[in-house]
Amino acid sequence: MLSNIKNLSLTKKLVYKIVFFIFCLIPFFSGLDSIPPLDRDESRFVQSTYQMIETNDYINIKFLDEIRAKKPIGIYWAQSIFANIFGEDKISSYRYVSTLGALITILVLWKFSQILFGQKASLFVVSASMISLLFIFESHVAKTDTLLLSFITFQQYLLLKIILNKKKSILFDLIIPISMWLALGVGFLIKGPISLVVFIFTLSSYVLWSKDINLLKNIRPFWGIICFMIIVFPWVFIIQKLSLIHISEPTR
């Protein structure tokens, strides 16, 4: 009897989660193919990715005849994957990256806020994000911001898991820290050092506030930095080799 009640409760929770996820899809997928370009930068990102696909050159980013490599290459690679799958002539193909970023952000934020505030409060937090006009707008624009936000949110969630962990296991000792550094590296490839700045600020603020020096060891900085460099360094090296940009040039 108790087992049946427990199974029914788990089934209801699963149904709630599925319904909630479907509810998330409605504002983010509406109008992706019918809304015209909303931003000057969106047109530039789309055109640059389109040229990347047409020329089959996935390193040398260009907007028309102008070299466009002041921002890292991650967003162009992500957009090109969706454009190759769904069609390079459809504006929605390039926007799916931002939509996916928005969905990942919502799902990670849901888990994040469950840990911090509990089940009921987490629904309020996520619902507030979902009805934000700015958030919905950004999920419809083929730019970097929403995808970057998803990796920053995921990285912060993993850092929280490391902070709260009190037991020894390969999951918390290696897999979660390495995953956090990988998310940090991908975030860097999307929009430069912004994800790194957020990570350093959060980490240093928590350590200064809590006096928990062990956290600096628990994030596995040695292996983490190696993983970070494996992701970031090849692009930096290639760009320097091709003399496309100077790393010190400010991002537009």
Annotate each predicted stretch with a short phrase:
Residues 2-248, 252:
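Membrane-integral, polyisoprenol-dependent glycosyltransferases
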